[in-house]
């Protein structure tokens, strides 16, 4: 079981995401999230899924692609740091990734399947970690962060985006 990180294991800007993860079994919480996304967006038609709520905001499809990309990046960071790799990892510009991903050209079902697959890979990594590995840390985007904090960021980021999607779809 991966325990909740201490406040000194991550930069303050990650606190919002980590706070969205409830106490209890992190991995079980993470296992359920893809189904929550599916329940929210699976019945949308393509027009609904590509229409942003307001100009400059992301569409449902772009949000799904963003969740996948962010999870891959955070998972990669977790893998590197768990393996005691001390090489500093650069940050990424999420808006550039969203534009380059061209998620609006993909089907919603394809994006949901990708999310489930990415989450499965993340869970496999996290389930394999020893306590020592989960407590290791490294530098990403100029800030120190532990592997277990990254696990909580992954879950909390997905939860944050689920909440945004709920609001967006509620109108």
Q: At which residue positions do the language-model features occur?
A:
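Short, contiguous, helix-prone interaction/anchoring segments in small proteins
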Residues: 21-56
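Acidic/histidine-rich alpha-helical segments that form the ligand environment
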Residues: 29-40, 96-135
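Active-site rim elements
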Residues: 21-25, 107-112, 148-151
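Short, contiguous, pocket-lining structural segments
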Residues: 25-29, 114, 142, 153
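Short, contiguous alpha-helical
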Residues: 1-16, 50-94, 120-123, 135-171
């Amino acid at each position: 079981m991966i325990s909740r990180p201490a406040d000194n294991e991550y930069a303050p800007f990650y606190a919002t995401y980590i706070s969205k993860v409830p106490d209890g079994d992190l991995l079980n919480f993470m296992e359920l999230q893809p189904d929550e996304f599916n329940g929210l967006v699976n019945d949308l038609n393509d027009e609904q899924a590509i229409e942003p709520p307001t100009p400059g905001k992301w569409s449902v499809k772009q949000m799904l692609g963003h969740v996948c990309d962010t999870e891959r990046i955070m998972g990669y960071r977790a893998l590197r740091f768990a393996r005691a790799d001390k090489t500093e990892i650069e940050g990424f510009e999420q808006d550039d990734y969203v534009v380059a991903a061209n998620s609006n050209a993909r089907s919603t079902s394809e994006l949901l399947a990708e999310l489930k697959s990415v989450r499965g890979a993340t869970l496999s990594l996290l389930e394999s970690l020893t306590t020592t590995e989960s407590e290791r840390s490294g530098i990403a985007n100029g800030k120190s962060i532990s592997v277990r904090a990254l696990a909580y960021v992954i879950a909390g980021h997905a939860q944050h985006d689920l909440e945004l999607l709920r609001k967006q779809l509620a109108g």
